[in-house]
Regions:
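Bacterial N-terminal signal peptides that target proteins for export
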Residues: 1-8
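Repetitive helical segments and hydrophobic/amphipathic motifs
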Residues: 11-12
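N-terminal targeting signals for Sec/Tat export/insertion, comprising classic cleavable signal peptides
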Residues: 26-56
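An amphipathic, aromatic/His-enriched active-site/gating alpha helix that lines ligand/cofactor pockets
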Residues: 48, 52-62, 80-114
Length: 125
C-alpha cells in the first residue's frame, strides 16, 4: 500500500511538472499610426502579410487588424502566437520581412504592447 501511494504521488508530481513545462502562448497588441498618404498601400501590404502568415505559419494563431473608425490612419493588431518561438520564427519569415521593409517609410509610429489574456484557454471562433 505504501509503495502504491508513493507511486501515485510521483505520478501526480510528474503530471504537474509537465503541465508547467508547456510553453505559454504569446499575445501582443501592435498599435500603429500610418502616414495618411500611404494608407491604401499600407493596407494592401498588411493584408498580404496577414494572409500569408495565417496560411503558412501554424504557430501564428491570430493576426487580427482593426482600423479606428474616427482616425483611419490608426490601427491595432491583436497578435496571438502559439509560443515565443513561433513569434521569433514569424518575424524572420520572408513574407513578414517583405511587409516590414516595404512599409517602414509608411509608418508614423509603432508601439508593441505585450499583454496577458484574461482567459487564455478561450479560442477565437
Amino acid at each position: 500500500m505504501k509503495n502504491m501511494l508513493i507511486g501515485i504521488f510521483i505520478s501526480m508530481a510528474a503530471c504537474a511538472f509537465n503541465v508547467g513545462a508547456e510553453e505559454a502562448q504569446m499575445t501582443r497588441l501592435s498599435k500603429i499610426t500610418v502616414h495618411a498618404d500611404h494608407l491604401p498601400a499600407y493596407r494592401a501590404a498588411l493584408a498580404e502579410e496577414v494572409r500569408a502568415s495565417m496560411a503558412l505559419e501554424p504557430g501564428v494563431l491570430s493576426l487580427y487588424a482593426v482600423f479606428d473608425k474616427e482616425e483611419p490612419t490608426r490601427l491595432t493588431i491583436l497578435e496571438i502566437y502559439a509560443s515565443r518561438q513561433a513569434y521569433e520564427q514569424h518575424v524572420k519569415s520572408s513574407h513578414f520581412l517583405k511587409y516590414k521593409n516595404g512599409t517602414l517609410h509608411m509608418v508614423k509610429s509603432l508601439e508593441l504592447v505585450d499583454v496577458d489574456p484574461l482567459l487564455p484557454e478561450l479560442k477565437i471562433k
